[in-house]
């Protein structure tokens, strides 16, 4: 693990070497925007905003992307909810449990699913306000996504309205699936088959399927 220390950001940013190629870009942007970001009460907290940079990328096949963190109590790990109270992760867990016949579980976390990286397009929001930090991340969001694209085989974007323009995000041809947001109206996500579609796409690429059941805390 490496560490990035900045003049205008008081928290050391730990990162895996797989992110090295964009660290200078991150440094330049945060040196400029960090002071304004520090003035906000954020979700996740300032020291946890870059937590996912600790994740390796070479061992990832799929990246699941949400638009931004929970507006309260985000941990820095996308979709993570330590007390399993968040509607989004509960809907995800219920969808996967129905498909793979997991009946009893206490929580779900993509962090434990081999080959999967969970990511937020915007790494933070103002506490209580979704999509409120677009201005802080617009210079880095696509940089992150395109860097991840060099490693993974499939992107799964959660939210048809949020990611309707995904083709303008990616600079290179990448297999992309855009599904319903877990909190979508009319409970469209309940019958969404995208987790299995992702596995079918991996098989077509002669890559191992994802064992989504690994994310359950039983």
Curated annotation (Swiss-Prot):
InterPro entries: UDG_fam1, Ura-DNA_Glyclase_AS, Uracil-DNA_glycosylase-like, Uracil-DNA_glycosylase-like_sf. It catalyses: Hydrolyzes single-stranded DNA or mismatched double-stranded DNA and polynucleotides, releasing free uracil. Its EC number is 3.2.2.27. CDD domains: UDG_F1_VAVC_D4-like (cd19372). One of its GO terms (biological process) is base-excision repair, AP site formation via deaminated base removal. GO terms for molecular function: DNA binding; uracil DNA N-glycosylase activity. PROSITE patterns: U_DNA_GLYCOSYLASE. Keywords: DNA damage, DNA repair, DNA-binding, Hydrolase. The active site is at residue 68. The keyword Phosphoprotein does not apply. It comes from the Viruses. Pfam families: UDG. Belongs to the uracil-DNA glycosylase (UDG) superfamily. UNG family. Homodimer. Interacts with protein A20. Component of the Uracil-DNA glycosylase(UDG)-A20-polymerase complex; A20 and UDG form a heterodimeric processivity factor that associates with E9 to form the processive polymerase holoenzyme. PANTHER family: URACIL-DNA GLYCOSYLASE (PTHR11264:SF0). Excises uracil residues from the DNA which can arise as a result of misincorporation of dUMP residues by DNA polymerase or due to deamination of cytosine. Also part of a heterodimeric processivity factor which potentiates the DNA polymerase activity. Binds to DNA. This is Uracil-DNA glycosylase.
């Amino acid at each position: 693990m490496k560490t990035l220390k900045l003049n205008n950001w008081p928290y050391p940013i730990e990162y895996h070497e797989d992110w090295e190629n964009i660290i200078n870009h991150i440094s330049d942007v945060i040196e400029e925007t960090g002071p304004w970001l520090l003035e906000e009460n954020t979700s996740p907290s300032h020291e946890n905003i870059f937590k996912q940079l600790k994740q390796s990328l070479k061992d990832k096949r799929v990246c699941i992307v949400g638009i931004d963190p929970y507006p309260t109590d985000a941990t820095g790990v996308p979709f993570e909810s330590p007390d399993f109270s968040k509607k989004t992760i509960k809907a995800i867990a219920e969808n996967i449990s129905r498909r793979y016949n997991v009946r009893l579980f206490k929580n779900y976390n993509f962090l434990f699913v081999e080959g999967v990286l969970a990511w937020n397009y915007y790494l933070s929001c103002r506490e209580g306000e979704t999509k409120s930090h677009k201005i802080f991340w617009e210079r880095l969001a696509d940089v992150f996504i395109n860097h991840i694209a060099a490693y993974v085989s499939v992107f799964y974007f959660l939210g048809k309205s949020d990611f309707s323009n995904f083709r303008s995000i990616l600079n290179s041809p990448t297999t992309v699936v855009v599904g319903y947001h877990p909190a979508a109206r009319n409970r469209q996500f309940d019958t969404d088959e995208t987790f299995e579609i992702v596995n079918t796409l991996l098989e077509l690429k002669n890559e191992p399927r994802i064992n989504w059941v690994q994310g359950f805390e039983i």
